[in-house]
Amino acid sequence: MENNDVSQKKMADAVRFLAVDAVKNANCGHPGMPMGAADFATVLFSKFLKIDPKAPDWQDRDRLVLSAGHGSMLLYAIHHLIGYKDMTIDQIRNFRQLNSVTPGHPEYGHTLGIETTTGPLGQGISTAVGMAIAERILNSRFGDEIVDHHTYVIASDGDLMEGISHEAIGLAGHLGLSKLIVLYDSNNISIDGSLDLSDSTDQSKRFEASGWSTREIDGHDHAQIEDAIAQELKTDNPSLIVCKTTIGYGSPDKAGTSASHGAPLNQEEIDNMKNNLQWTHGPFEIPTDLKDAWRLVGLKNTRKRKDWEERLSKIDDKKKVKFLHAINGDISDLVAKNIQDLKEKYSNESPKLATRQSSQQVLEIINPIIEEMIGGSAAVSYTHLTLPTNGEV
């Protein structure tokens, strides 16, 4: 379901101008990243991302993590356009204001459609690896009919410079998480200036060394973006798509410069951007044809979601209970009882144990009860006593 009469470039421009207007209205924020990433984000949402704004908690939705959390207006603008009920135009106007649902960085549980809180660089991509692991584990338990979704990440240069990303990337490659796709907003600009002031890593080679499938594209060419995502959906490895973009895209004054990274465009610069992109609309104003095109994007997965709900309703009752138990994070009362019993034992006996030994004893009373338990230790599990002696984790 899509509106073929509306240019995807213009749909992306709608995202750009909402971001620019919101940051200017707040007099703070990061306009450059949403301006540069709007093209590949538009293709991702309109062509691939399996979500339904009318059912934001649909359990088999795709997950999208904006690891580059400073670019939050990219998500907020699109969420407004595709129809998340909390993301009204007034919320866009109130970007970064107290009591809004549009904080400077996305916050889980505060705003619909936000899968995890991001902001500290590297945190989002690492959390997404955990989400991709969870999808594969749940799929092995409940099958493709119930669990079959992808995890997408929008990551920045800064994300990939952080140490935490190295461990997560290595683990994802080692586990062969083929349903994990990272869209790397490679604009070669940091807030201090050109990226080469601080980093010269060939990210494609780094990811390849960790077992990822990689490709590089023009992050403003919609045909290249669509083809790249379509191809990476077919691989047996986690995927990195290096989207070469221009930060502050569309601004004749600030495109490609660090000046667009973390400061609003002034009115003259916005007027020049409007002339450059042939945008004739006022602040926070989206023309009807673009609104309609984006609303269709928001509706395109309704049928898939309803079909999934029907499949879920037909599975064995015991299996359904286990699935909902896992999804909701429900924990048996037996866990609390067993832990309390162990605490009383320690209190009565005062055993002399290393912390790792008492930790192992706790794990051994909860592992058999919590099927969702994931644990281990990087190459030293026998020393750390994180491997259970009474069953698999």
Name what the model sees in each region:
Residues 299-358, 366-369:
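Hard-cation-handling environments
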Residues 361-372, 377-382:
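Accessory "access/gating" subregions that flank catalytic or transport cores
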Residues 14-28, 184-187:
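N-terminal capping segment at the start of a domain
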Residues 1-14:
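Generic start-of-chain signal for non-secretory N-termini
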Residues 383-389:
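Conserved small/polar residues in nucleotide/adenosyl-binding loops
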Residues 51-54, 110, 116-295:
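Glycine-rich ThDP/TPP pyrophosphate-binding loop and its adjacent helix/strand module
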Residues 36-174, 373, 377-378, 385:
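Cofactor-binding active-site loop characterized by glycine-rich and histidine/acidic residues
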